[in-house]
């Protein structure tokens, strides 16, 4: 059985990196990053194993004598251990960049044992560090990199991201007309992959994911040689079901969302993740198609989605350009969905006790 790991940089991530020489070679230079110990304790409780991996330029040379390094490093390790933070391994590259060694990050020689088959849970393992080389190491290992920063991605934030439930769902819908495969990750952004065979529809689905702040993968094979009806309808049904499943018991979600974005088009969207499917829709189009998408299928898509997602959805748009009118509906729905699915606690947002 594979194991989830965190491969964590030392200087600038676990402990502060002295700006004058970037070396922790005296005891008075040793300072821990804010909240690092509580975060690591929580991450261990969630099943992560910890590996420290660090480049220490010229370790063992006059540039960084071994004895100068060992004192602060050993004290750091003793403090971590005394608080219950345990590292499975400490991996150190002692070379200078110009040595062209095989073990310096972002090269992978030091982590080869974890890259063997059946060791690493790559979907739930991460490299955490403050430099671009840490992210490159993650890419080389085939896992996700997180760039630590006190202001934008500090230890409490990293801990929250890695310990919250991964709201994910996978739905397959196979009929005589279509084969639809949908995956959604509500707590991950970017990297959506969408292919329905209808190019403009792909673009619209990407608007939902982008403005909704989540990731989805959609693959559809259908009877487009007839028209786009079954492809759009069944994609809406499958996506709605996937969103409903990914939301789980809905505890902590905002439940409601409302947006009124005004650009060339005025689009209105109100959403209630109510458990009751209903659609109110108002949009008029000049032409029968936008790109390769039938404009009449826009309403049908949202009706199908609201039915399987079991939500109450109100959509309305006004404007002069059909392309922009259609896009405004998908964009407004995405922004509204972002509000409604956001988790802000653990209470069920219903006086009835059920959604």
Swiss-Prot record:
This is Histidine biosynthesis bifunctional protein HisB. Zn(2+) binds at residues 93, 95, 101, 103. Residues 167-355 are annotated as: Imidazoleglycerol-phosphate dehydratase. Residues 1-166 are annotated as: Histidinol-phosphatase. In the N-terminal section; belongs to the histidinol-phosphatase family. Its cofactor is Mg(2+); Zn(2+). Gene3D superfamilies: HAD superfamily/HAD-like, Imidazole glycerol phosphate dehydratase, domain 1. Its EC number is 3.1.3.15, 4.2.1.19. Keywords: Amino-acid biosynthesis, Cytoplasm, Histidine biosynthesis, Hydrolase, Lyase, Magnesium, Metal-binding, Multifunctional enzyme, Zinc. It comes from the Bacteria. It is found in: Cytoplasm. Pathway: Amino-acid biosynthesis; L-histidine biosynthesis; L-histidine from 5-phospho-alpha-D-ribose 1-diphosphate: step 6/9; Amino-acid biosynthesis; L-histidine biosynthesis; L-histidine from 5-phospho-alpha-D-ribose 1-diphosphate: step 8/9. It catalyses: D-erythro-1-(imidazol-4-yl)glycerol 3-phosphate = 3-(imidazol-4-yl)-2-oxopropyl phosphate + H2O; L-histidinol phosphate + H2O = L-histidinol + phosphate. The active site is at residues 9, 11. The lineage of its organism: Bacteria, Pseudomonadati, Pseudomonadota, Gammaproteobacteria, Enterobacterales. Its main location: cytoplasm. Mg(2+) binds at residues 9, 11, 130. InterPro entries: HAD-like_sf (IPR036412), HAD-SF_hydro_IIIA (IPR006549), HAD_sf (IPR023214), His_synth_bifunc_HisB (IPR020566), HisB_N (IPR005954), Histidinol-phos (IPR006543), IGPD_sf (IPR038494), ImidazoleglycerolP_deHydtase (IPR000807). One of its GO terms (biological process) is L-histidine biosynthetic process. The keyword Transmembrane does not apply. GO terms for molecular function: histidinol-phosphatase activity; imidazoleglycerol-phosphate dehydratase activity; metal ion binding. GO terms for cellular component: cytoplasm.
């Amino acid at each position: 059985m594979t194991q989830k790991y965190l491969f964590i940089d030392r200087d600038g991530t676990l402990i502060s990196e002295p700006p004058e020489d970037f070396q922790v070679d005296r005891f008075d230079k040793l300072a821990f990053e804010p909240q690092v110990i509580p975060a690591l304790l929580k991450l261990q409780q969630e099943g992560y194993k910890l590996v420290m991996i660090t480049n220490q330029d010229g370790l063992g040379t006059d540039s960084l004598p071994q004895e100068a390094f060992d004192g602060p490093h050993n004290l750091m390790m003793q403090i971590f251990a005394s608080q219950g933070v345990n590292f499975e391994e400490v991996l150190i590259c002692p070379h200078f960049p110009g040595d062209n060694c095989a073990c310096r990050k972002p090269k992978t020689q030091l982590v080869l044992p974890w890259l063997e088959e059946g060791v690493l849970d790559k979907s739930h393992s991460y490299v955490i560090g403050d430099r671009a080389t840490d992210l490159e190491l993650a890419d080389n290992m085939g896992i996700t990199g997180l760039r630590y920063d006190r202001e934008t991605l500090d230890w409490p934030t990293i801990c929250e991201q890695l310990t919250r439930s991964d709201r994910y769902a996978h739905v397959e819908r196979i009929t005589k007309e279509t084969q639809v495969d949908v995956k959604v990750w509500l707590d991950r952004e970017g990297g959506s992959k969408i292919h329905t065979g209808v190019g403009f529809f792909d673009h619209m689905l990407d608007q939902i994911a982008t403005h909704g702040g989540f990731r989805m993968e959609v693959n559809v094979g259908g009877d487009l040689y007839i028209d786009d009806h079954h492809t759009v309808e069944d994609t809406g049904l499958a996506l709605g079901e996937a969103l409903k499943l990914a939301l789980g018991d809905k505890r902590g979600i905002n439940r409601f969302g409302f947006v009124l974005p005004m650009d060339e088009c005025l689009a209105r969207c109100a959403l209630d993740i109510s458990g009751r499917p209903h659609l109110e829709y108002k949009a008029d189009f000049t032409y029968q198609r936008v790109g390769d998408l039938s404009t009449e299928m826009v309403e049908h898509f949202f009706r199908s989605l609201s039915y399987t997602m079991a939500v109450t959805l109100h959509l309305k748009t006004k404007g002069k350009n059909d392309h922009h009118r259609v896009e405004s509906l998908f964009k407004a729905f995405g922004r509204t969905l972002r509000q409604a699915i956001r988790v802000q606690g653990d209470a069920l947002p219903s006086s009835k006790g059920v959604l």
